[in-house]
């Protein structure tokens, strides 16, 4: 891999376990601050489905040799600077940081064909600049009924937009036509973002 990564070291990234949506927001913020010319090529990607049961492999929280886990949702960061160069930055994966799109999708999501329909994955892809403006979370989803934390929150204040106290559900929702960005099935997601070098070469002739 080349070394012109947006985030050379995972240790230099803001990270709090179980707050993936905020971790990715912080990555977008870092690009806006340090590499603003690249922000338009970056995306926040939410993974979920109607039942909020999505299996992912190669996750630090996963079990067994395949490190599989079932999340209610997950969020990762993508940088797509060229047609045949899309990199995924997932702070919760056991794959390299970053990983090329095709390898990440193949090892993390595998295929929907072997899964029950209720476990099929959908992807809400939001441009990074939109995510920075519209995302807002007061972290209520991480509190128990008695007000205690399910997992300790980040030390910085909640990320709040000017218009909404808590809109996390709009990002997790996978209904087309609702919420920011665009929603894709797994096959649509791959078709949209994966361009093999051969296909790109043919297109450029």
Curated annotation (Swiss-Prot):
<dbReference type="GO" id="GO:0005634">
    <property type="term" value="C:nucleus"/>
</dbReference>
<dbReference type="GO" id="GO:0008418">
    <property type="term" value="F:protein-N-terminal asparagine amidohydrolase activity"/>
</dbReference>
<comment type="function">
    <text>Mediates the side-chain deamidation of N-terminal glutamine residues to glutamate, an important step in N-end rule pathway of protein degradation. Conversion of the resulting N-terminal glutamine to glutamate renders the protein susceptible to arginylation, polyubiquitination and degradation as specified by the N-end rule. Does not act on substrates with internal or C-terminal glutamine and does not act on non-glutamine residues in any position.</text>
</comment>
<comment type="subunit">
    <text>Monomer.</text>
</comment>
<dbReference type="InterPro" id="IPR037132">
    <property type="entry name" value="N_Gln_amidohydro_ab_roll_sf"/>
</dbReference>
<dbReference type="GO" id="GO:0070773">
    <property type="term" value="F:protein-N-terminal glutamine amidohydrolase activity"/>
</dbReference>
<feature type="active site">
    <location>
        <position position="90"/>
    </location>
</feature>
<feature type="active site">
    <location>
        <position position="20"/>
    </location>
</feature>
<feature type="active site">
    <location>
        <position position="74"/>
    </location>
</feature>
<keyword id="KW-0378">Hydrolase</keyword>
<dbReference type="InterPro" id="IPR039733">
    <property type="entry name" value="NTAQ1"/>
</dbReference>
<dbReference type="GO" id="GO:0005829">
    <property type="term" value="C:cytosol"/>
</dbReference>
<dbReference type="InterPro" id="IPR023128">
    <property type="entry name" value="Prot_N_Gln_amidohydro_ab_roll"/>
</dbReference>
<comment type="similarity">
    <text>Belongs to the NTAQ1 family.</text>
</comment>
<dbReference type="Pfam" id="PF09764">
    <property type="entry name" value="Nt_Gln_amidase"/>
</dbReference>
<protein>
    <recommendedName>
        <fullName>Protein N-terminal glutamine amidohydrolase</fullName>
        <ecNumber>3.5.1.122</ecNumber>
    </recommendedName>
</protein>
């Amino acid at each position: 891999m080349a070394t012109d990564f947006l985030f050379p070291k995972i240790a230099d990234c803001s990270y709090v376990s179980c707050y993936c949506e905020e971790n990715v927001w912080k990555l977008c913020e870092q690009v806006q601050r340090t590499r603003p010319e690249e922000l338009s090529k970056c995306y926040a990607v939410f993974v979920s489905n109607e039942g909020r049961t999505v299996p992912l492999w190669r996750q630090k929280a996963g079990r067994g040799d395949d490190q599989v886990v079932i999340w209610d949702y997950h969020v990762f960061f993508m940088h797509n600077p060229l047609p045949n160069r899309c990199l995924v930055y997932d702070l919760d994966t056991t794959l390299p940081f970053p990983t090329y799109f095709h390898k990440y999708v193949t090892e993390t999501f595998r295929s929907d064909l072997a899964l029950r329909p209720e476990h099929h994955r959908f992807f809400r892809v939001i441009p990074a600049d939109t995510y920075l403006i519209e995302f807002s979370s007061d972290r209520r989803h991480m509190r128990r009924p008695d007000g205690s934390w399910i997992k300790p929150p980040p030390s910085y204040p909640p990320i709040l937009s000017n218009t909404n106290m808590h809109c996390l559900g709009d990002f997790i929702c996978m209904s087309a036509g609702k919420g920011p960005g665009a929603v894709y099935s797994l096959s649509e997601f791959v078709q949209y973002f994966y361009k093999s070098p051969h296909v790109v070469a043919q297109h450029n002739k």
